[in-house]
Amino acid sequence: MNAPENLPLRDFKNHDLVDDIGKPGVRVERRPARRPDGSVVPGLYNAWIWLDNPGQYNSYTTDMVKGVILAMRAASNDRAVNCVVFTGVGDKAFCTGGNTKEYAEYYAGQPQEYRQYMRLFNDMVSAILACDKPVICRVNGMRIGGGQEIGMACDFSVAQDLARFGQAGPKHGSAPI
């Protein structure tokens, strides 16, 4: 930051909601921004947010939804971050939606709990939409169901050659709204 020599650099307030954004199943990393020639741009970063549940095609659990919300908010607040890359671990899937194992074990038969979960999911979509930085969805493999919905909330998508996109809900009597 360039400040006149007689003026001190300003101390900025921390606007993050929590100090620790770490949640199981979500990885967050700041990577240095690079110029087209590959050289690093000093003091400028890209935030990388990974869904990390490759054994279940990066389907998101309740904790992962919370982690994405916190990570998007932190990236949005980080003055040194210029964009967000949102992706999934591995090459099989960006995300296949909600974790059906968690649905079956906890949410089945508990409509009030499921309503709270869906509210949290909507908050995740809102966090992506509200991010002050461009959000790039990096699609590796499948982007299905709720994964398609969160991917569409991003500013744009970049997909590998074998990426697959789809919506599972209509086959089961539901559709995104």
Name every feature range the model reports, one short phrase each.
Residues 49, 86, 99, 150-151:
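Hydrophobic/aromatic residues within transmembrane alpha-helices
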Residues 46, 107, 162:
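Ligand-binding pocket scaffold of soluble enzyme catalytic domains
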Residues 1-89, 112, 126:
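Conserved CoA-thioester-binding segment of acyl-CoA-metabolizing enzymes
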Residues 64-68, 117-120, 150:
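Hydrophobic alpha-helical membrane-association signature
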Residues 9, 15-18, 88-124, 143, ...:
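Glycine- (often His-adjacent) and acidic-residue-rich active-site loop
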Residues 124, 128-130, 138, 144-177:
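CoA-thioester-processing core
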